[in-house]
């Protein structure tokens, strides 16, 4: 191959999918005699890494590149008259989790094709507490949610999703007691919130009807 798998993740996934049987018979892949088509995704563009405040060295890939990789594999399998099992060892914590993203819609469509089976990895986040599910009772005005951020963290992107037709607003209370009142829904565009003592800046954006799901998105 003209390139190498520097991370080793793709090689590991290929072994799980199609690895040959070991000498002692303790391991072999799901389909050890299959033919393998490999797509190596290029890293996400710098401006996207900056926008999402990704840590240096963190692996990140663009959804459109993944979709183009799937298209290539579909054409490759069709040109050889072979069925396709498309294994994606990639994941994200973003999105509505309802299959309404462009990639989600593509995978749902492919799942209905004869001779095409999308296989996705899941569960790697385990108990890392990167998701929170809550609700506000009728007799309550708000619910407190605590975010624990490491000292070395330069920043992160957080998404809050409401279940249609619910709408929410957010406010903030810093560890030193600085309080930001709830930001009204009437505000359009980005809202910049600054905590002077923590030297922290928060950007809030309301999307009251996200294009794919129709639900409210706050990020």
Please identify what each model-predicted range represents:
Residues 62-68:
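Active-site-proximal cofactor/substrate-binding loop regions of enzyme domains
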Residues 91-219:
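Substrate-binding/specificity loop regions of serine endopeptidase catalytic domains
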